[in-house]
């Protein structure tokens, strides 16, 4: 089991990378900051939204965790995301749960690669696997 709680920015990716490398039976992460993708991504059709810093940051949170989920699925994990606590307690309330199946998901990895290219990012998770 690999577990991380409020690991800031790429520290979550480090934990996930450790889990993937060791073929951990389960990975449970509660991400915190999402600065890595925030600094990288751009997508012209969203420029009217992303010119507002707060909206760009919230979209970066979603993109980061969505990419993480797709990558984990591609590497053989069944992934679920849940709100583990009320958003009134903390807005950083997403828990990523991944259970190792051993069956790599080619479609998820293709979608991951496609989204990466579309938004011009190099997610940190790849550096830690």
PLM region descriptions:
Residues 1-129:
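Class I S-adenosyl-L-methionine
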């Amino acid at each position: 089991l690999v577990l991380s709680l409020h690991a800031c920015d790429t520290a979550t990716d480090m934990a996930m990378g450790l889990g993937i490398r060791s073929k951990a039976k389960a990975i449970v992460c509660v991400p915190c900051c999402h600065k890595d993708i925030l600094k990288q991504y751009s997508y012209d059709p969203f420029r009217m939204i992303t010119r507002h810093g707060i909206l760009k940051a919230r979209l970066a949170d979603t993109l980061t965790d969505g990419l993480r989920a797709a990558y984990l699925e591609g590497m053989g994990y069944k992934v679920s995301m849940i709100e583990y606590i009320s958003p009134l307690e903390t807005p950083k309330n997403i828990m990523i749960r991944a259970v190792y199946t051993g069956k790599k998901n080619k479609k998820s990895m293709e979608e991951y690669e496609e989204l990466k290219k579309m938004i011009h990012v190099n997610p940190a998770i790849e550096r830690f696997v």
